[in-house]
Amino acid sequence: QEWMSSLMRPSSTLSAGAFFIGVWMAFLAIINILFGAYSDGRRVNWIDFFTNGADTNSAHDVTLVFPDDIVFILLSSLLIAAGAMGMGATREDGFRGWLSGMPRERVVTSTFSTENGLGRTFASWMIVAGAAYYLMWSTLESTWVDPGVYSVMISFVMVGIGLNWIQDAKLES
């Protein structure tokens, strides 16, 4: 029964992931409404895009498209809220404490110092490199939903996160 209760407790890792993915989705929704997130400034029709429908993109005009943009914004809001609530439940200082303490987290401070080891510095820079690649490519090419760019970006980011977790495991043992 103990293993069952551990599965039902909120996870700070899962909460942080939900929060960051929700923020990223909200960012994409704003880009899609203002400029179009698909290539050549076209807008993404989110429902068809995720279900592999026939009309994954359309000509851009600065308006909300119902239900696509509304559903995507609601989904991003739910992920942000779930992440904030989960983080609030897992930490004594709550969500605000986690958010305000983020600049002092080992992953962030290791981008500017080797104090926590060269492995963690390398891991942190992998995360930065992945995010920078995605932002630069998407800005220069005006396409924010390119699967090839995602695959390169997520490879860098997840290897960086994984290497940071390995460093955390070394500290615990």
Question: What kind of region is each of these model predictions?
Answer:
Residues 1, 94-118:
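Membrane-interfacial, low-structure loops and terminal tails that flank and connect transmembrane helices
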Residues 5-26:
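Alpha-helical transmembrane segments and their helix-start/interface "positive-inside/aromatic belt" motifs
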Residues 17-21, 117-127:
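Select subsegments of transmembrane alpha-helices in polytopic membrane proteins
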Residues 29-53:
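Membrane-helix interface motif
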Residues 30, 122-151:
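Alpha-helical transmembrane segments and their membrane-interface junctions
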Residues 51-74:
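Membrane-interface segments at the starts/ends of alpha-helical transmembrane spans
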Residues 149-173:
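Alpha-helical transmembrane segments and their immediate juxtamembrane interface regions
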